[in-house]
Amino acid sequence: MTLERTGRDEEKALTQPPSGHSSVQAGKVGVLLVNLGTPDGTDYWPMRRYLGEFLSDRRVIEWPRAVWYPILYGIILARRPKKSGALYAKIWNREQNESPLRTFTRAQGQKLATALADKENVIVDWAMRYGSPSIETVTKSLIERGCDRIVMFPLYPQYSATTTATVNDKFFEALIEMRHQPAVRTVPAYPEEPVYIDALVRSIERHLATLDFEPEVVVASYHGIPQSYARRGDPYYEQCLATTARVRERLGWDEKKLITTFQSRFGPEEWLQPYTDKTVEQLARDGVRSIAVINPGFVSDCLETLEEIAVEADRTFREAGGKNFTHIPCLNDSDEGMAVIESLIRREMSGWA
């Protein structure tokens, strides 16, 4: 009798947590959408915090810290927050007091959650690489809500160490201190995925159908990276060209109708070329009167698309003699854009949900 009771007691001890031990929820799959980031406001200090975090990332600026930090903290962060804040103020979502990137990313998360309603064990959330909500905060929140598996989706169609890799880095950093880590998967870049190319083609066709002019040239403008990064093995340049080529094939256009350029260069280094601003200016000087610009590498409209392209590139083109300019919006939370996100997430969740 004593031995039987002892055996039952030992079995009970193995199946029940120790006294005071917190219960562990399990069985859910977290989906984490991550975009680049946004300041919390347009004033000096919110901009300085955001720019400081962004520009101190070793994946973004690969210069030796002894060279870069005096420039960053001594010059750039003293001057650039005011200038950048003024630019953000032009596109700021004043109704929700946030940048459009945050508005669109939240909407993508909400719509994805609705689309995945058939998966009862899935929780969808979103985060930013720089600024808030942070990857660490949201990752911990998913785990606290019972997720023992997480699919993390860096929202960058083309891979670069400056974007996809640094999001992966930050996500893995969030796991380092955890004793009980979740199983994880990361969604790879998708520069030639049929669902993505189809979404871009539909977006282009729909937008051009609303115009009262026919663009002579359509410019596919991607965010640039320093040429030195590409020489050291970053595949971004080739993947951008591949995306443009697939879109061009689907539309039946030639290489003069749809061209690839790169924008947003920063600092003294040579970046990927041709540069967008110089290209639209030269097109106008060469007699082209009507163009359209699309940003295939941006999942959501943001400062670089709404201000740098829709405003500045438009002005540059017209001042050089151009007449008609249109910016084709990013996929954002459109039906086509959400089809891309949902399709890739369902594929990567295979076997989990």
Swiss-Prot record:
Major location category of this protein: cytoplasm
Pathways involved: Porphyrin-containing compound metabolism; protoheme biosynthesis; protoheme from protoporphyrin-IX: step 1/1
Catalyzed chemical reaction(s): heme b + 2 H(+) = protoporphyrin IX + Fe(2+)
Binding site for Fe cation: 223, 304
Gene Ontology molecular functions: ferrochelatase activity; metal ion binding
General function of this protein: Catalyzes the ferrous insertion into protoporphyrin IX.
Family to which the UniProt record says this protein belongs: Belongs to the ferrochelatase family.
Name used for this protein in its record: Ferrochelatase
Species: Chelativorans sp. (strain BNC1)
